[in-house]
Structure formats: C-alpha cells, structure tokens
C-alpha cells in the first residue's frame, strides 16, 4: 500500500509541476516556489485529514509601509498552541525564490509571491507545522505561524521603485509581523524557534539574531534553516549563476544597507547574501538542515538552462540516475564545498547540523521527510527527531552523511 501511495504521489507531483510551469522570459525561474508547493503535496492525504489554517492580513502594516511588492498587506497563518505549548512559539518563514530584475519583480506582483491578493486564503499545516503528535512530536502543540513571503528578497529590502510601483519592503514586513505576533502573545514565550524553508531558510539565517533580540534573556530562542544553505558555487559552464542572480536581487532591491555590517566590512554586498559567509557569525543557536545535493541548486545554480545550452545536463538534473560519472563527480564536488562551508559553524556546541546526501529540498515542511515511518534518517534519527534533540538539548546533533549513493533512506526529487 505504501508503494502505491508513493507512486500516486509522484504522478500527482509531476502533473502539477507541468501545469505550474516556470517564470521564464530570462528572469529568475521560481523553481523554489514550485518545489516548495509540490513537495507539500507528495504525501497523498485526504483534505479532510489536513489542518487548514486561515490567512490573517496585518492591518497595521500599511501605516508603516510594510507592504508586498504590489502594495497590498502582508499576512500570516497562525494556529494557536495549547497545553504545554501555550507559551511556545514557532515562526516558519515561507520560501519562494527571489526577483532579481525589475521585470521579474513586476511579474511577481501578479502572483502570491508578490501580492496578498493572490495568496491562498487557507494553507495546510504539515510537517513541522502539523498539530498531530504522531506527525510532529516536539512542536505539535506550540503556537505555529507561517509568515507569507511577498517581497522577493528573503524579508530584507527597504526601498521602492516609484516608476514601476514596486515596494521592496521585506525588512519592514519582518518588523511589522513580529510586532503583531508579540501583541498576540509571543511576548510571553518561554521557548521560540524561527524556521524557514529555502528562500525562507535564508531569511531565517539573515534574521536569526534579530529574532533573539525580541525576547528577554530567560526565553530559549533558536533558529532552523531548512534548504537555506545556498552556495556561491561554480556552475557547469565555469561561471557563477547563483552569484549573478543574487547580485541582481541585492542591486534591484538595494539591500546593501540591510545586510550584516560585520560581513559587509570585509566582503561585497552580494557575498553577504550567501549563507556560507554568514552562519559562523550568528550568535544565536542555529540548526542547518540541508540536502547535500539540493534539488533547487542543481536545477537553478549548478546547471540552469542558461548555461547548459547543449542540453547535456537536462536528463541528469531531472533524474540523478541518468547522470554519467563525470556529472556525479561534479555533484560530489558541490557536496564537498557545502560540507567545508559548515565546518566552522559546526564546531559550536550550540549549533546543529543535518546534511543528508539526497537530491531533495525543504525537508521540514513535507510530512514524509519530516516524520513518517519511512522518512530519511541519519544516525538512526529522522529530521524531526534530530531537530528536537538539538532544540531541547537532549543531545548534540552533528550529522553529515556519507557521499551519494550510500544513503538508501532518501526521498529524492525527480523531474520529468
């Protein structure tokens, strides 16, 4: 029965991927958005069994200029905690790529990633947001929030383009959302966790220490970045596709003044948007959860269509079983780059690491990769168990997988 469900889920996933398409026309393709959405649907579950949480718009945001790209109000989904979790808060920052040109930001205004007019009115809470103890053993009864992403720069911008009526106000959205949640009871939090997936995982890194400053010293505050370890890596043509993309984001949204000053004193602003140059300087305890062969980075950073003009990587990046030995070695070099980048970070006793050798993305939001009977494991522990062990100081977690293809527990993504 389990295999039937997995096959059915895969068929649904492939169909939805084709239907959604991509943001093309030479701009940043929102593959991150697609993967995040599609992964949440991988487990075939009846809608009646899912916790559906309504959207709340932040009414006070408008007067502060804390608005989405198109000027609409930002929003979040909150499911209140209960029992022992009544004064515990988990904030999940939504992912969804970036816009790196005026044109791509204008397009983004017509989607839920740039306008609350297009956001779903209810969202399913699964994985780390689930309210079931058998699906989310450590955080199921916490106050759980999903903060919607509509600024295109991982909640960091504070400028605008008047001629195009674009509002780059991610930093203001962050502040406005935190003020609202504090007024909703988060100021009484005994424990708090800031998490995020993909572009939201990067945002969790960028805002981690700011999040800590919201609470008194008696509150336990930690951060989780899921699939947020975007690497300044060489692509298959020898160039730096992701650096070019990030440079566009930093320039278009004028992020220079919003980035870590400790970093920008030594490196250029674009380098200070890459987590590898930030994580070791974060003072708040943090957990890095990442697939060593991150599916989004394989698709859009290592072998994007713009540099694979011959299409020689198309089959390989769609399904790693179609890769030749030299292509696999290219991925192994990328894994080594990532592992080396977290070595200093991992030396801190307060930090946690879970890097599995899978072709995956956003493993905390999906139920089948977060906590399920056949979930991916490292050292005999699921992602959920590992994050819980780290957060509650049950044990240290420094789990780095052996290279592909040694891990047989992966839920790898395959594109058609």
UniProtKB/Swiss-Prot annotation:
Glycosylation sites per record: 131, 324
Stated name of the protein: Pectin acetylesterase 3
Function of the molecule: Hydrolyzes acetyl esters in homogalacturonan regions of pectin. In type I primary cell wall, galacturonic acid residues of pectin can be acetylated at the O-2 and O-3 positions. Decreasing the degree of acetylation of pectin gels in vitro alters their physical properties.
Catalytic residues of the enzyme: 198, 294, 361
InterPro entries from the UniProt entry: PAE/NOTUM
Organism: Arabidopsis thaliana (Mouse-ear cress)
Cellular localization per UniProt: Secreted, Cell wall
GO terms for biological process, alphabetical: cell wall organization
Any one GO molecular function term: pectin acetylesterase activity
Entry keyword set: Cell wall, Cell wall biogenesis/degradation, Glycoprotein, Hydrolase, Secreted, Signal
Gene: PAE3
Keyword DNA repair tagged: no
EC number: 3.1.1.-
Disruption phenotype: No visible phenotype under normal growth conditions.
Signal peptide stretch: 1-25
Family: Belongs to the pectinacetylesterase family.
A GO cellular-component term linked to this record: extracellular region
């Amino acid at each position: 029965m389990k295999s039937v469900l997995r096959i059915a889920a895969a068929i649904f996933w492939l169909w939805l991927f084709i239907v959604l398409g991509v943001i093309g026309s030479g701009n940043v393709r929102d593959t991150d958005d697609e993967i995040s959405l599609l992964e949440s649907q991988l487990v075939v579950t009846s809608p009646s069994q899912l916790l559906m949480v309504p959207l709340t718009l932040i009414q006070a945001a408008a007067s502060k200029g804390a608005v989405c790209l198109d000027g609409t109000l930002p929003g979040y989904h909150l499911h209140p905690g209960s029992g022992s979790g009544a004064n515990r808060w988990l904030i999940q920052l939504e992912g969804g790529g970036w816009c790196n040109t005026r044109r791509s930001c204008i397009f983004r205004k017509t989607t839920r990633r740039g306008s609350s007019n297009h956001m779903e009115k209810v969202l399913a809470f699964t994985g780390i947001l689930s309210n079931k103890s058998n699906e989310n053993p450590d955080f199921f009864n916490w106050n759980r929030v999903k903060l919607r992403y509509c600024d295109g720069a991982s909640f960091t911008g504070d400028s605008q383009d008047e001629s195009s009526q674009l509002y780059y106000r991610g930093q203001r959205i962050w502040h406005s959302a935190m003020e609202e949640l504090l007024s909703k009871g988060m100021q009484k939090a005994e424990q708090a966790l800031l998490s995020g997936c993909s572009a939201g995982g990067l945002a969790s890194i960028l805002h981690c220490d700011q999040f800590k400053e919201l609470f008194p010293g008696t509150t336990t505050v930690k951060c989780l970045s899921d699939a947020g370890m975007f690497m300044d890596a060489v692509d298959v043509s020898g160039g730096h596709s992701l650096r070019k993309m990030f440079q566009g984001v930093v320039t278009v949204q004028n992020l220079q003044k919003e980035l870590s000053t400790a970093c920008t004193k030594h490196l250029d602003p674009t380098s200070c948007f890459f987590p590898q140059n930030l994580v070791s300087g974060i003072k708040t305890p943090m957990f890095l959860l990442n697939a060593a062969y991150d599916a989004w980075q394989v698709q859009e950073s290592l072998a994007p269509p713009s540099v694979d003009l011959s299409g020689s990587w198309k089959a390989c990046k769609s399904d790693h079983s179609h890769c030749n030995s030299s292509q696999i070695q290219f991925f192994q070099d990328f894994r080594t780059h990532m592992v080396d980048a977290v070595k200093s970070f991992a030396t801190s006793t307060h930090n946690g690491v879970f890097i599995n050798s899978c072709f995956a993305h956003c493993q905390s939001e999906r139920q089948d990769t977060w906590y399920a009977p056949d979930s991916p494991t490292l050292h005999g522990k699921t992602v959920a168990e590992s994050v819980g062990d780290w957060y509650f100081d049950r044990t240290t977690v420094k789990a780095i997988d052996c290279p592909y293809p040694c891990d047989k527990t992966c839920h790898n993504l395959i594109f058609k």
